Amino acid sequence: METEHGEETPPPAVPSGTVAILRDGQSGLEVLLVRRPASERDTFSGLWVFPGGKVEAGDITHGDDEVRSALRAAVRETQEEVALQLEHHELVPLNRWEPKPVKALAKRFSAWVFLARATDAEVVVDGVEIREHDWFAPRHAMNLHSEGEIGLSPPTWHTLHELGQHHSVDHVLAWATNRAPEHYYSSFGEDSGHTVIVWHGDELVDGNADARHRLWLIDGAWRYERNV
């Protein structure tokens, strides 16, 4: 599709839902991550992610907003990928992620991240979409990423950063329930020779001098900075 000026209109972002499943481990809060298989067609090839996937026709009910459809997709995909049946009403919306349209991105996702308490059921991966899983303390997963042991996407890394501020499932769910989800409309920039992903409020987005809301993508040491 083209605009009246002859420019191509980027395709709309694909709605999707993913869920960070939480449990209290021996040393504190833990979250389930699953590893996507290597595939040239998979945007998240080889990365460790939360269970989830795109919204399909059966997830949509007349009158729903996007978050409700994404929630259904997250519940359905979790059951398909890791055999855990979550209750819809127990999921708490955390944030919504969407990259800014750029030509380099053939496909974009508008991804809702939800939080949910783990059930007592055993995790069983489907062996197709998912072949590995593990429970991680959020900060440990971030450290493994810094050391090059596991791959994470920026939204997953940022979510782990938020989870790492909490010591228990009760604590993080209470925090998430009493805040409004944020919309992270991601765009890339450069500062001091380093690539950064910037969001609402940052100097590179809104022009406010010295305002920071960004993720520095420095090899081996991603760093989140926010003062707005």
Regions found by a protein language model. Name each.
Residues 1-130, 135-228:
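N-terminal leader/linker segments that precede catalytic domains of diphosphate-processing enzymes
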